[in-house]
């Protein structure tokens, strides 16, 4: 389902824990990390699609989260031709997204990367809200920066370090906790994690990597 400009409606999810750390998922059998996201099906509202994707990709139910905010307008990114099926080139341009900021009110053990038979992630990690975006596939980095920046104003204020994250000040120990979005580096060989991250991969099962109708060849959702 494309709009008249060739963009497919989509939702993205920035999921916080109680420390205002953000969920990152490692795209299955790849070296890239990303936030949960997925297409809006015909007849769905963006919020309905968000809750469906939340369960399909990370196993959470509506009762496990609190909706904090969403972006006001669609945020768009174009997909390079090499990631688009040949029969879709010329009329498919990319994705337009509504981004949601959610806070987990459940527990880490509620997360389940195998909630469906076609998992999107094989590892996950909580990380600081502002981290370099070099672990994100290149053509999504600008929309991630826009979404994080717009939603940052709604971060719950009970976490003491939020004021440093929003203002770009330094913490008492001298650690810079401000906007790192401009520090986007070239990917290095091997698995790249967000700074300070570690992961415990799920052993591969040989499952096919379904795209659920997306006109891509090898692109993360």
Swiss-Prot record:
EC annotation from Swiss-Prot or TrEMBL: 3.6.1.-
Cross-referenced CDD domains: NUDIX_Ap4A_hydrolase_plant_like (cd03671)
GO MF annotation terms: pyrophosphatase activity
Keyword Hydrolase recorded: yes
Pfam family, one: NUDIX
Keyword annotations of the record: Hydrolase
SUPFAM superfamilies noted in UniProt: Nudix
Domain of life: Bacteria
Family designation: Belongs to the Nudix hydrolase family. RppH subfamily.
Cross-referenced NCBIfam families: PRK00714.1-2 (NF001935), PRK00714.1-4 (NF001937), PRK00714.1-5 (NF001938)
Function statement: Accelerates the degradation of transcripts by removing pyrophosphate from the 5'-end of triphosphorylated RNA, leading to a more labile monophosphorylated state that can stimulate subsequent ribonuclease cleavage.
Protein name listed in UniProt: RNA pyrophosphohydrolase
Record organism: Verminephrobacter eiseniae (strain EF01-2)
């Amino acid at each position: 389902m494309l709009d008249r400009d060739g963009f497919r409606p989509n939702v993205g999810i920035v999921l916080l824990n109680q420390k205002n750390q953000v969920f990152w998922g490692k795209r299955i059998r790849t070296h890239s990390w990303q936030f949960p996201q997925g297409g809006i099906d015909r007849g769905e509202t963006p919020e309905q699609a968000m809750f469906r994707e939340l369960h399909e990709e990370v196993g959470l139910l509506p009762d496990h989260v609190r909706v904090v905010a969403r972006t006001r307008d669609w945020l768009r990114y174009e997909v390079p031709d090499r990631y688009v099926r040949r029969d879709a080139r010329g009329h498919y341009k990319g994705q337009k997204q509504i981004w949601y900021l959610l806070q987990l009110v459940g527990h880490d053990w509620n997360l389940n990367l195998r909630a469906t038979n076609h998992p999107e992630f094989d590892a996950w990690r909580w990380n600081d809200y502002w981290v370099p975006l070099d672990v994100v596939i290149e053509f999504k980095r600008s929309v991630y920066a826009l979404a994080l920046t717009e939603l940052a104003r709604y971060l719950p204020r009970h976490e003491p370090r939020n004021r440093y994250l929003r203002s770009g000040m330094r913490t008492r120990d001298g650690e810079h906790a401000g906007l790192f979005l401009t520090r986007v580096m070239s990917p290095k060989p091997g698995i790249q994690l967000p700074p300070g991250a570690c992961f415990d991969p799920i052993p591969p099962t040989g499952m096919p990597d379904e795209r659920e109708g997306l006109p891509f060849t090898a692109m993360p959702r």
